[in-house]
């Protein structure tokens, strides 16, 4: 049996015998063969050592390829599992799953009565290093389903048996390295000696298959990179991220709390946190107004007839909350779009009324398993800055470009860099392929006309249309998915939305779903970590604290505070019977942007000493000058202090 192989440049290589991608790489260049770690075969990622089909297109995966981590991190997950089995005994260790995740990998274990802690990680790492030095080959093999089940039963691996029984295929794929065998689709590195730089990070609990009705397993997380410098940089970033964890900083600053006993996954915002949310909404409302949007409010609960018609009942029901009254079933809204559609349908629409741009700070509820809840970043109830644009097909491209410009206006004051993903048709899509292709092309044209960097995520669109996801990069280099622009030709069809064109005929509008913050709660959590709690002045819950040096300066401090409050500044007076240094320290811990130190000299000269939270001072400033500049900083939503400070 021969092989006919097409290379990325379109050239063809033919062989009269079976070959692997490693063979092809060696034929092309010995240097290339050394750099290759995997291969893409007809769009799928394969091991280098897997025999190629008779006809195929291949693209070798090199170390710098963004897909490269899929190979070495997956191999690390198997090395981790093998190490755990060697240490704790193959008779005691029951294997769950061990996938690649963003920036790393994990493996789930059932260890019976053995309880892992982070103190166990060094000895597991040591055993992993031994396995790497052994340079064990990873050998892929397939078994018929029944033989695969028998193999896993013989090895006393009940979780693997369950996975095989659920396979739709009649064949199961395994990988062997030394004495270790695991159910796995791959891909992997050729041998354990081909991986180097890793670190085990943490141990946590995880329900089998993410279902809290199942047994709690023990999950070990790890990370791995192609270069030592990349691993070191990531670990440094992770250390910084721990310091910035919004789940610690938020309660410390009195921003929010959670009651997992009474309202799991539902944030409780305290006065200071509510101030920040209101400032974010105020900013958003200003930009919406400039772009021609109209704010609306729609019902929190609507009956099941609406959700059947919208398609959410069939495609999203498992994530919804329900109630029943008067023999009528209702759902708490997981999305705002049906309510906005009802506004569109409330009157006859003409082409002159379009585009109609409706937006809402809508509270939505979506069920999330308890195991995935994560502070403000993964909740069950949250606020969306949700908007829907109803327009003609002729208006579509310009409206999409306007939304992209809107994204830039919102993200710029926070200092975020961002990029876009174009997400295409998923397997469970609604509607016609032709309409999907038209919608996808419209999104692509809009992105390219703006000149925005983007990549394509095949199959990652929503069930009712393709979308653009925006990813922001925070101050320590992490990416967060926030804004979404979603095209929808399906919902107008389902709700029979129409408008009368210039020829007096009825036409179907196009619908654009759009959120910029995304989840306001999640965006808040991201900002806490982005700023490490030290919000710019316009967002800070308390913008200024007046600090009287002693009791005799309290009246002057109140006078200064009242003057600033009259100008709209959020200001407190610290009247505690504590030392000035104590008060300054407390203000710094509370991340208050400005401290006004007020003593005899300031009172007599009717001036103030301005201290920034970083410790820099300006002496003898007139209150009127400070107030004017502060208002300018706040109104322009500046990310840095407007004042020029000198270090003491």
Swiss-Prot record:
Pfam families recorded: HGTP_anticodon, TGS, tRNA-synt_2b, tRNA_SAD
Root EC class: ligase
Keywords of this entry: Aminoacyl-tRNA synthetase, ATP-binding, Cytoplasm, Ligase, Metal-binding, Nucleotide-binding, Protein biosynthesis, RNA-binding, tRNA-binding, Zinc
Region annotation Catalytic: where it falls in the sequence: 245-536
Coiled-coil region(s): none
Principal localisation: cytoplasm
Limits of the TGS domain: 1-62
Protein name per its UniProtKB record: Threonine--tRNA ligase
Gene name linked to the record: thrS
């Amino acid at each position: 049996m021969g092989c006919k192989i097409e290379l990325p440049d379109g050239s063809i290589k033919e062989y009269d015998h079976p070959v692997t991608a490693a063979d092809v790489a060696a034929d092309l260049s010995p240097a290339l063969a050394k750099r290759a770690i995997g291969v893409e075969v007809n769009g799928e990622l394969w091991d280098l050592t897997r025999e190629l089909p008779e006809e195929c297109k291949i693209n070798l995966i090199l170390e710098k390829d963004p897909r490269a981590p899929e190979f070495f991190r997956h191999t690390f997950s198997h090395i981790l599992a093998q190490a755990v089995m060697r240490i704790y005994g193959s008779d005691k260790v029951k294997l769950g799953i061990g996938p690649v995740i963003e920036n790393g990998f994990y493996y789930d274990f059932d260890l019976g009565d053995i309880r892992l802690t982070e103190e166990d990680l060094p000895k597991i790492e040591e055993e992993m290093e031994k396995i790497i030095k052994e340079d064990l080959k990873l050998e892929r093999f397939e078994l018929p389903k029944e033989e695969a089940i028998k193999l896993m039963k013989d090895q006393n691996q009940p979780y693997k048996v369950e996975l095989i029984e659920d396979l739709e295929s009649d064949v199961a794929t395994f990988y062997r390295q030394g004495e270790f065998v695991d159910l796995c689709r791959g891909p992997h590195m050729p041998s354990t000696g081909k991986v180097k730089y890793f670190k085990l990070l943490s141990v946590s609990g995880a329900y089998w298959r993410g279902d809290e009705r199942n047994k709690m397993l023990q999950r070990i997380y790890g990370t791995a990179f192609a270069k030592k410098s990349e691993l070191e940089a990531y670990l440094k970033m992770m250390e910084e991220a721990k310091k910035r964890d919004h789940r610690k900083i938020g309660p410390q600053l009195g921003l929010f709390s959670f009651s997992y006993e009474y309202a799991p996954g539902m944030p409780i915002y305290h006065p200071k946190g509510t101030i920040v949310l209101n400032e974010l909404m105020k900013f958003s409302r200003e930009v919406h107004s400039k772009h021609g949007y109209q704010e609306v409010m729609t019902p929190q609960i609507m009956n099941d007839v609406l959700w059947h018609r919208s398609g959410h009942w069939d495609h999203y029901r498992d994530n919804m909350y329900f109630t029943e009254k008067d023999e009528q079933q209702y759902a708490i809204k997981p999305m705002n779009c049906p309510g906005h559609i009802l506004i569109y349908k409330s009157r006859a629409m003409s082409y002159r009324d379009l585009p109609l741009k409706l937006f809402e700070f809508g509270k939505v509820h979506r069920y999330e398993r308890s195991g995935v809840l994560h502070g403000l970043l993964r909740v069950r109830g949250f606020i969306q800055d949700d908007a829907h644009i109803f327009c003609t097909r002729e208006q579509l491209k310009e409206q999409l470009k306007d939304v992209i410009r809107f994204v830039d206006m919102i993200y710029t004051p926070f200092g975020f860099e961002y990029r876009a993903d174009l997400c295409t048709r998923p397997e469970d899509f609604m509607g016609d392929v032709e309409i999907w292709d038209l919608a996808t092309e419209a999104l692509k044209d809009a992105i390219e006309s703006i000149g925005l960097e983007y990549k394509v995520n095949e199959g990652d669109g929503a069930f009712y249309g393709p979308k653009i996801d925006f990813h922001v990069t925070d101050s320590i280099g992490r990416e967060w998915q926030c804004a979404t622009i979603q095209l929808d030709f399906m919902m107008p069809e389902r709700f029979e939305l129409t408008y009368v064109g210039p020829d007096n005929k009825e036409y179907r509008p196009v619908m654009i779903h759009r959120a910029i913050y995304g989840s306001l709660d999640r965006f808040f959590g991201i900002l806490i970590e982005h700023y490490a709690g030290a919000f710019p002045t316009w967002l800070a819950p308390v913008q200024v604290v007046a600090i009287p040096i002693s009791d005799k300066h309290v009246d002057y401090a109140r006078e200064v505070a009242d003057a600033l409050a009259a100008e709209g500044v959020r200001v407190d007076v610290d009247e505690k019977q504590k030392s000035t240094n104590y008060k300054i320290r407390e203000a710094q811990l509370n991340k208050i942007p400005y401290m006004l130190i007020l003593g005899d000299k300031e009172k007599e000269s009717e001036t103030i000493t301005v201290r920034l939270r970083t410790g820099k001072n300006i002496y003898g400033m007139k209150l009127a000058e400070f107030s004017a500049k502060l208002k300018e900083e706040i109104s322009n939503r500046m990310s840095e202090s407007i004042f020029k400070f000198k270090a003491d």
